[in-house]
């Protein structure tokens, strides 16, 4: 994992994953509430809608994606992994989501998968076979989802799409450590 600051926003990323991505930090946004620091990307943490959407635009620009392509469903601490498409772009931020899950998978370019974590573990997987066949998977892995085998569920989806274990790269983002318990 490496850290980068782009357009005033600091984020972590993995050089192993060759799609635009980032694991946000709290650095670089416009939030003013003390408990959110500056880059709050959640509607339920005390910032107004416009502040969260401005932070989203800043983060998206920093990592090189269109903020309207981001999907972010309510998370339920499960092992549910949902396949999503361009029709789902913007769900959770710009239109009602209509579903809840803790993981997404897509084979379509221009779809950005967003999970929110605090103590839980963000996991990003990219599967690639040849120059055209690609899938991306993002997971919110808390202890409940991990116990329910969310990573195994995601790998099962990737295998069902025809990818082999050697086609898949994964990055584990920043999360809470045992020192905090």
Question: What residue spans do the PLM features occupy?
Answer:
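Active-site microenvironment for binding and transforming phosphate-containing groups
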Residues: 1-181
């Amino acid at each position: 994992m490496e850290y980068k600051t782009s357009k005033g926003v600091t984020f972590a990323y993995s050089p192993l994953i060759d799609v635009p991505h980032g694991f946000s930090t709290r650095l670089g946004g416009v939030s003013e509430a003390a408990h959110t620091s500056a880059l709050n990307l959640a509607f339920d943490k005390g910032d107004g809608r416009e502040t969260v959407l401005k932070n989203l635009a800043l983060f998206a620009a920093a990592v090189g994606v269109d903020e309207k392509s981001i999907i972010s469903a309510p998370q339920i601490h499960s092992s549910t992994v949902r396949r999503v498409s361009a029709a789902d772009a913007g769900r959770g931020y710009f239109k009602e989501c209509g579903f809840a899950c803790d993981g997404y998978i897509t084979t379509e370019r221009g779809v950005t998968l967003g999970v929110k974590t605090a103590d839980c573990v963000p996991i990003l997987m990219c599967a690639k076979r040849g120059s055209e066949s690609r899938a991306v998977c993002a997971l919110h892995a808390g202890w409940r989802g991990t116990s329910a085998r969310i990573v195994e569920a995601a790998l099962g989806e990737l295998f069902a799409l025809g990818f082999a274990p050697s086609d898949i790269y994964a990055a584990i983002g920043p999360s809470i450590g045992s020192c905090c318990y």
